[in-house]
Amino acid sequence: LNEAAARLGVSLRQTEDELTRDMLASTAAFINCTAGVNGDNPTELTRSDVDDVVRALLGNNAYTILDNIEGEDKFGTAPVRDAYFALCHTDLTKDMDSVDGFIQKNQYPSPMNALRSEWGAIGNLRFLVSSIGSITQSASNLGANVYNIFCVGMEAYACIEQDGKYCCL
């Protein structure tokens, strides 16, 4: 019974994640990546695109969600800035690894402070990956899939239950 209850709990949380993803996809303002070199629109993710998003969040007085991780005297590590969340699909992990300034989670001075789904950080964005991340099929100018990355600050949205129905604001 306990195992079945635990599995149902996981299923519930995944359903809530899918509902939240769909809500964000239908309501969020967007900034297309344009600094890449693949000849498509939107392009692949670059550091310049990340900087544009961070400037937009700062310009709208968004509060960061996570505190910085101070640097330590350890080989192969780098300090991590205060950060917003960037929620994305697992298919983007290879692309993130090639972005200038990307810090993998295992390169944090204290990787145990990272979230389980966290892949790494670029500037003031810490990327959380999920296999149920948002994809818009054949939406680029050249017909490629567009992977949506939801970049959020603290209290950017809330999910509540009303009359037994799940709702995101």
Question: Across the structure, where does each feature detected by a protein language model lie?
Answer:
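Alpha-helical scaffold segments that mediate packing/assembly in large oligomeric complexes
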Residues: 1-72
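Exposed beta-sheet edge/beta-hairpin loop segments within beta-rich domains
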Residues: 1-3, 77-78, 169
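Hydrophobic, aliphatic-enriched repeat segments that assemble into extended interaction scaffolds
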Residues: 9, 85-88
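An acidic- and aromatic-residue-enriched active-site/binding cleft used to recognize and process polar
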Residues: 24, 89-91
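A generic local secondary-structure boundary/capping motif
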Residues: 72-77, 117
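Sequence/fold signature of self-assembling virion shell proteins
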Residues: 40-64, 83-84, 91-169
